[in-house]
Amino acid sequence: MMKPSIAEMLHRGRMLWIILLSTIALGWTTPIPLIEDSEEIDEPCFDPCYCEVKESLFHIHCDSKGFTNISQITEFWSRPFKLYLQRNSMRRLYTNSFLHLNNAVSINLGNNALQDIQTGAFNGLKILKRLYLHENKLDVFRNDTFLGLESLEYLQADYNVIKRIESGAFRNLSKLRVLILNDNLIPVLPTNLFKAVSLTHLDLRGNRLKVLFYRGMLDHIGRSLMELQLEENPWNCTCEIVQLKSWLERIPYTALVGDITCETPFHFHGKDLREIKKTELCPLLSDSEVEASLGIPHLSSSKENAWPTKPSSMLSSVHFTASSVEYKSSNKQPKPTKQPRTPRPPSTSQALYPGPNQPPIAPYQTRPPIPIICPTGCTCNLHINDLGLTVNCKERGFNNISELLPRPLNAKKLYLSSNLIQKIYRSDFWNFSSLDLLHLGNNRISYVQDGAFINLPNLKSLFLNGNDIEKLTPGMFRGLQSLHYLYFEFNVIREIQPAAFSLMPNLKLLFLNNNLLRTLPTDAFAGTSLARLNLRKNYFLYLPVAGVLEHLNAIVQIDLNENPWDCTCDLVPFKQWIETISSVSVVGDVLCRTPENLTHRDVRTIELEVLCPEMLHIAQPGPSPPQPGDYHPNGGPTSASPYEFSPPGGPVPLSVLILSLLVLFFSAVFVAAGLFAYVLRRRRKKLPFRSKRQEGVDLTGIQMQCHRLFEDSGGNSGGSGGGGRPTLSSPEKAPPVGHVYEYIPHPVTQMCNNPIYKPREEEEVAASAAQDTGATDRGGPGTQPTGMAEVLLGSEQFAETPKENHSNYRTLLEKEKEWALAVSNSQLNTIVTVNHHHPHPHHSAVGGVSGVGGGTGGDLAGFRHHEKNGGVVLFPPGGGCGGGSLLLDRERPQPAPCTVGFVDCLYGTVPKLKELHVHPPGMQYPDLQQDARLKETLLFSAGKGFTDHQTPKSDYLDLRAKLQTKPDYLEVLEKTAYRF
């Protein structure tokens, strides 16, 4: 047989490698089924539930399926199973409900709104080990509630409303190890409740427990206890709680998770029970007497059975428990310790203590998960639940916090009380950002640098009691935005700066008792949410309400006892304030020190008349309405500021003064703005069309003003014989060139200078005669009512020098009566303009009048006239005032002479002139004035012999085009006719 060649061997080797690599690759890409996944479901599931197999157990998930009764689950399972029935609607568990589910090892009934469990409801569940009843509405555990659960090891009933537990409720649960009853309403635990059980974990947080007695209660718990939680209960720290304190000193220090915080009495509120001495809790008895009276056994003299009494005694050993580890650091290099004895494992192979709502539980560790770094000379305790470290450095003789080396990791609580620390610097807490409690009490601290606690953002409790601090400033508390409890009692504090606590918005408790305070500054408590305040044993004579006590909106308790209150008028606001809060909120008495007649009397029992007699004098002046801030003997303040009271002659608070000034300022601004808007609107608003009576009234005003102007001018210029008719003053001289704006005549003066508006003597005589003759002359047939400002055209109308007839002149009163009569009889309210484009441009206006009845060439051609008292009144040739072309129109036909309202004639047809009359402008332009005078000359110069051949129309139009830049009322009258 031939041996294979080297080439064949190499080929075979390559093939083997290829096969091997292929096998490895195939193994990587092909999943290997796990034992758990390979298990087949050999049990039927129940619709609509979901089933699976985990860890050799059958899991049946029936959460949120709407079940109202256990009997609705009709399936039977022969193998051990876990049943999940969370978030259903089972209000009650009936007797023998679980008989067909006898193989269940865990049942979760959480969040079902359960209200009652009938006797024997759990019959048949002999192998059940875990029962979850959390988040229901159970209010009682009776002696027969848990019958049939002999194998139960874990019971979770948190977040219910349990108020009563009967003493035999757990007597049949001999294997119970974990009991979770947190967040219920349990006020007291009955005697011998835990006699038949051996608990390792007990959670009683968030109930209403005030005390736990030793006999029949604590003596049954401590036999195998590994973890105890008692937080968030209103513990009453008096003589009775000494039993609990003494018992806590006999169990491992780390077995207690959290603090036991005192609720009452008030001077212990917020303090840890373990930090209070027994002599303070019960000052009348010694420790041995207290223990003897309460039946607490003395510690055994044998070292083997002695438990450490306080953290400082645990100096030579390391204790490993279910939830914490204690480690002591010494000056020497620590030697390796022996492996501690492992605690007796729990009865179940699984973990026993899950979270509040999570069924799976991790097993407890017996070794610290991380290395412990503890400062030299201190004792450290590590809690497994949050990996927080408690550093105990009490009574170690430290002079500075910087001596704490090495710095611990994740320290939660740091106790440095009873040392020799004098100053606190900003750099002292550079590696303590995780602290939630810092105890610096009973040192010699007199200086705290601003921002010293800025590196402690998570700090919730700060103890600075029993030091030498004299002043509190806002900078001291910078960075303490999470602080809840602050203790400053037994210092020498004399001064608190304004807004000292404003940087601590979450502050709930503040102790300032036993200091040297005499007053509190403004805004001392602004920005805080204080619920408890202790001001006991200071030197307060009174406390201001405004700016101080008024900020205590969330106050629950306040201690004001042992202060030298001065019961005078200054105390009235304070008295009113303490009467408005609940009587339960004020701890103790508020006794007067002065004056002598009120010594040792409670401020709340003194009437206001006795406290402040001056108030009687203030209240006597009578029935004036109550003003804000007033106090009355039988009542409180009458305003929303119930504590703003100033004694007689006292100064007005600055805040009230500033507020009043602001109110006045804004009121003045709004009033001024309103007036400005009103005036502006009035200026811009156009006058509406008016009635005939309003036109007459306006005309009367203008006429009277013109008459006054005539008489004033006549008086100034004099008259012949002293009785001459007053004449209008001569027109003003034109201003010199370059000063065209220096003289601006008033429009009324210019208007009255126009001869067409001057009253004629014949008209005055006729009006006087009409007034004398009475109603007969006015109302007889054939008579015409006197027109209001009749338009008279004729040679006599334009005479520049009227006739001297003293009998025709009347007083101003007579003229006013005449104008009033004319107003009442006025019938006309419209005017039409004269047409300038007539076929005979060379005819003058006067010529047209001369030819009434047949002349048609002038501007007034076609008008017929009516002579009355020597005057001429024009009538249209047809229509209302006679025949001919219309110059004057009326609303309805009347044979009376036509009269024209003067004001409406001027302003009714030209809005711009009306606006000029209402708001005279500041100036007038010379060209407009000259144009108006030129028109006046052209229109009314007939009396001076002006004829049509002297000024042809073309020259007039050229001259007017040169002088006039804006239309005036005469131009408008010449071109357009309006009816209004």
From Swiss-Prot:
Protein's organism: Mus musculus (Mouse)
GO biological process: axonogenesis; gephyrin clustering involved in postsynaptic density assembly; neurotransmitter-gated ion channel clustering; positive regulation of synapse assembly; postsynaptic density assembly; regulation of presynapse assembly; synaptic membrane adhesion; synaptic transmission, GABAergic
Bias kind Gly residues: ranges: 715-725
Tissue occurrence: Broadly expressed in embryonic brain with highest expression in cortical plate, pyramidal cell layer of the hippocampus, thalamus and hypothalamus.
Cytoplasmic side: 677-980
Keyword Signal among UniProt keywords: yes
Extracellular side: 30-655
Domain LRRCT intervals: 233-284, 563-614
Record's bilayer topology term: Single-pass type I membrane protein
GO CC, any one term: cell surface
Task of the protein: Suppresses neurite outgrowth.
Protein name: SLIT and NTRK-like protein 3
UniProt domain LRRNT: residue ranges: 365-407
Spans traversing the lipid bilayer: 656-676
Subcellular location: Membrane
Family, as annotated: Belongs to the SLITRK family.
Signal peptide: 1-27
Gene: Slitrk3
Glycosylation sites noted in the Swiss-Prot or TrEMBL record: N69, N597
SMART domains assigned to the protein according to its UniProt record, in alphabetical order: LRR_TYP, LRRCT
Residue ranges, annotated region (Disordered): 326-361, 622-644, 709-735, 762-785
Ranges: LRR repeats: 79-100, 103-124, 127-148, 151-172, 175-196, 198-219, 410-431, 434-455, 458-479, 482-503, 506-527, 529-550
